[in-house]
Amino acid sequence: PYLFEASELNIMDGKFVYTYHTSWSDRNDWSKFTKRNGQPAPSTCSMCYMVSDNPLDPESWEYRGEYVANPGSFGFSFGNNHTHLQKFEGNYYLFYHSSMLEQSMKTGASGFRSIGVNKATVNESTQKIGKVTMSKTGISAIKKLNPYELQQAETMYL
């Protein structure tokens, strides 16, 4: 419900987990969605997810809820978001963008985004994604890198 952008499809324990960013529209028609699983309507411009056994059957999708509120809920500017759920060394991490860079520049300019990463709690057997909080600090380093060896840019969060 309320699809806007930032779609991603993952597979967990044989089920399809579809994550997406919700729209700016009001939620007055929330009751018309029958497969909402007792969940409240998502907040405006938040990240939500749905689960299905058969992704090609539109009636098979079950709404599971919001897993990240709008960045404005965490002290950043209100705006749309894109996330990526990544499993690494047995843990899940949520990558997202925020306006932290824009705010720190204090130039009045807009549209500058920076990437953030926080740990996510995911139960693969039930396809439950816990609520994730965006932060300015992110996560601690997962392991140390050798400063005398060439390091690829994608290791910057390890």
Regions found by a protein language model. Give the residues of each.
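Carbohydrate-active catalytic/glycan-binding domains of CAZyme proteins
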Residues: 1-158
